[in-house]
């Protein structure tokens, strides 16, 4: 494998990230040259210089292997997280080395967890940088880099095995460059529409843009310590529910529906399961909250119950209430939603509705085969017959996913973190959800937790964002031969 070629492509990603740092510095300058201006400007120059070295000294090549392409994807994520710490470390404040790494990984993986006790105390430029990391991460660092790497788009690089933000392997099969165009149109369009709607609902331009970027990236970063609860607006909640739910749908399906290539978005079996789960889960939580008299009005219970459930299923992590104070039944449903999550081909993390549907179909098929041993039963998803290898991959992924949650839980308890915090933190981190329960609840943060716990959860974030095996494979020596 040609490491220099991989470094060249990763270098382009670094330069692209440097542009967002420069844009954040511009926001800082417009805001009166706040204390983040020079840290952001210096970080931009440093990142651009580091990215320029391989571009200058490594000759451009038109062909790369699948293994090299794989390393471009994983390497871009890791490097993005590393250089993403620069503005935090140079600015200082609450950002120690561990805290800066955690915040950067949380942003680029669109997890949305934070170590900040007072988000509102951040300079506006640094605030915008946090949202830039999550917005870039939502689409995928590599996807953005492909916009300026047309040569890479002509190669047979299978991103859908590694890069979670690309279109899933189903009946939407496009060349890489067309995938980028589809993702960009849907992503930017949804962000713009959400920004305008939030502004009309009463937010200022900065808050509306930042929350739209966060919602469309299914991240959950907020400009306020109390998250969306700060605004206390049913209209804003409704707009964000729409944005989050839409961002959790397969982007290729959204594009096909909007352009008329597909007549009805509800024709997708996975989408029906996903939207049905959102409504059913939100309604069950509503009934639980109303019956427990946590909210005396049914409309208030429905507003908060639906919002929180949509927020965790789409792995966004916004909050309109402190779910630590809710019923045990509501907590169980929220944890279930944090594990299952939204559709493949979206910006969400987690196991994905697609895999859940296939797992249930496999169980049903197994029961039918016990009744009819000689029957040949095909499993279909959205009309496409699923190969045996693909079905095995689904079950292996689910088992690995649950084992990592268990490992993260045990690891946290070893270092003195209580069971609920360890478990929900592991679920929220590997699913890129953000908030959990206990000390990492929807109105809390990771600041008071041990540094080793923050590092283990940042590792879970990367594992979840890179589909587990995409990251683990790098540590097998035979793979590099």
Identify the meaning behind each predicted range.
Residues 1-481:
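Membrane-proximal intracellular helices of multi-pass ion channels
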């Amino acid at each position: 494998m040609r490491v220099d070629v991989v470094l060249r492509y990763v270098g382009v990603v670094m330069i692209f990230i440097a542009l967002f740092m420069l844009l954040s510095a511009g926001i800082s300058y417009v805001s009166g040259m706040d204390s983040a201006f020079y840290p952001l400007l210096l970080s931009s120059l440093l990142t651009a210089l580091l990215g320029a070295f391989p571009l200058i000294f490594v000759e451009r090549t038109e062909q790369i292997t699948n293994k090299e392409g794989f390393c471009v994807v994983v390497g871009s994520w890791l490097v993005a997280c590393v250089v993403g710490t620069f503005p935090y470390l140079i600015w200082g404040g609450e950002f120690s080395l561990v805290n800066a790494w955690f915040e950067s990984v949380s942003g680029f993986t669109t997890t949305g967890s934070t170590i900040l006790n007072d988000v509102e105390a951040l300079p506006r430029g640094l605030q915008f940088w946090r949202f830039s990391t999550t917005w870039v991460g939502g689409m995928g660092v590599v996807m953005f880099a492909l916009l300026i790497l047309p040569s890479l788009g002509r190669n047979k690089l299978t991103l859908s095995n590694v890069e979670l933000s690309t279109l899933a392997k189903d009946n939407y099969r496009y060349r890489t460059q067309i995938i980028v165009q589809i993702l960009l149109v849907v992503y930017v369009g949804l962000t713009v529409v959400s920004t305008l709607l939030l502004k009309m609902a009463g937010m200022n331009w900065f808050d509306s843009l930042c929350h739209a970027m966060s919602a469309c990236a299914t991240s959950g970063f907020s400009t306020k310590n109390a998250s969306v609860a700060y605004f206390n607006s049913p209209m804003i909640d409704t707009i964000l529910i729409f944005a989050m739910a839409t961002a959790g749908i397969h982007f290729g399906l959204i594009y096909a529906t909007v352009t008329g290539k597909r007549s009805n978005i509800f024709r997708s079996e996975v989408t029906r399961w996903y939207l049905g789960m959102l409504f059913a889960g939100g309604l069950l939580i509503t009934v639980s909250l109303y019956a427990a008299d946590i909210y005396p009005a049914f409309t208030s219970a429905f507003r908060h119950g639906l919002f929180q459930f949509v927020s965790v299923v789409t792995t966004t992590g916004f909050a309109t209430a402190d779910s630590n104070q809710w019923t045990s039944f509501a907590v169980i449903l929220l944890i279930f939603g944090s594990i299952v999550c939204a559709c493949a081909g979206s910006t969400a993390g987690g196991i994905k509705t697609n895999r859940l549907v296939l797992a249930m179909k496999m169980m049903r098929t197994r029961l039918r085969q016990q009744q009819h041993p000689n029957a040949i039963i095909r499993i279909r998803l959205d009309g496409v017959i699923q190969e045996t290898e693909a079905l095995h991959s689904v079950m292996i992924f689910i088992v690995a996913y649950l084992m990592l949650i268990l490992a993260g839980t045990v690891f946290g308890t070893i270092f003195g973190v209580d069971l609920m915090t360890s478990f929900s933190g592991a679920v929220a981190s590997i699913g890129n959800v953000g908030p959990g329960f206990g000390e990492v609840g929807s109105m809390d943060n990771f600041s008071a937790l041990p540094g080793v716990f923050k590092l283990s959860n940042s590792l879970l974030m990367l594992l979840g964002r890179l589909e587990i095996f995409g990251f683990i494979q790098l540590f097998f020596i035979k793979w590099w031969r």
